[in-house]
Amino acid sequence: MTDEPNQDDPQGPEVEAAKPSLKQPPMYKVVLLNDDYTPMDFVVEVLQRFFNKDRSQATQIMLHVHTRGKGVCGVYSRDVAETKVSQVNDYAREHEHPLLCTMEEA
């Protein structure tokens, strides 16, 4: 008997299957920042248009942003969060408002 692998064995040495270690991708909060110039109605419109909030939810978030300085609009994957930030900032500029939207890791 030798310690060499059996050349006649078509399957070769027994190999244990590696278990993939998958983890969830990081999520990001999309945040609106308060300013003294953007009308409250415009902020509500943005929340309805880009974050699919109903009027009541949008008003609550807008008031939170107004009183606390910033508020979370939603939590998304990185690509979705980046897209929403870009859409909101572009839309605000088109309408000549200084509203600023950012993202931060959740």
Curated annotation (Swiss-Prot):
Pfam families: ClpS. GO terms for biological process: protein catabolic process; proteolysis. Residues 1-22 are annotated as: Disordered. InterPro entries: ClpS (IPR022935), ClpS_core (IPR003769), Ribosomal_bL12_C/ClpS-like (IPR014719). Binds to the N-terminal domain of the chaperone ClpA. Involved in the modulation of the specificity of the ClpAP-mediated ATP-dependent protein degradation. HAMAP family: ClpS. Belongs to the ClpS family. This is ATP-dependent Clp protease adapter protein ClpS.
